[in-house]
Curated annotation (Swiss-Prot):
Source taxonomy: Bacteria, Pseudomonadati, Pseudomonadota, Gammaproteobacteria, Enterobacterales
Organism: Shigella dysenteriae serotype 1 (strain Sd197)
Pfam families named among the record's database cross-references: rhaM (PF05336)
Pathway where this protein functions: Carbohydrate metabolism; L-rhamnose metabolism
Main location: cytoplasm
Any Gene Ontology biological process: rhamnose catabolic process
Self-association state and partner proteins as the record states: Homodimer.
Name this polypeptide is given: L-rhamnose mutarotase
Catalytic reaction equation(s): alpha-L-rhamnose = beta-L-rhamnose
Length: 104
């Protein structure tokens, strides 16, 4: 398994709405994530800094990257643009983090 972590932002007035939209996520999106090898996906909110920290275990980079081209992911990204900063393709603005420590 490959561990990935990344940081995104959420709009200051959208914390509750962001959480509402993720509890639960659309069943179709959950199915796509799982079918593309995503496991143990978690997102944490730092309310003071409007930051989202996400962590996911994936089976392969290729399968993980393929999620972005699915119709359901494209719809989800568009759905989320009013609660978080987005790139021109509607994907969330994010920065991948480098793992510096892991305790199995």
């Amino acid at each position: 398994m490959i561990r990935k972590a990344f940081v995104m932002q959420v709009n200051p007035d959208a914390h509750e709405e962001y959480q509402r939209r993720h509890n639960p996520i659309w069943p179709e999106l959950e199915a796509v994530l799982k079918s593309h090898g995503a496991h143990n996906y978690a997102i944490y909110l730092d309310k003071a800094r409007n930051l989202l920290f996400a962590m996911v275990e994936i089976e392969s980079e290729e399968r993980w990257n393929a999620v972005a081209s699915t119709e359901i992911c494209q719809r989800w990204w568009k759905y989320m643009t009013d609660v978080m900063p987005a790139n021109p393709d509607n994907s969330p603005v994010s920065s991948e983090l480098q793992e510096v420590f892991y305790l199995p």
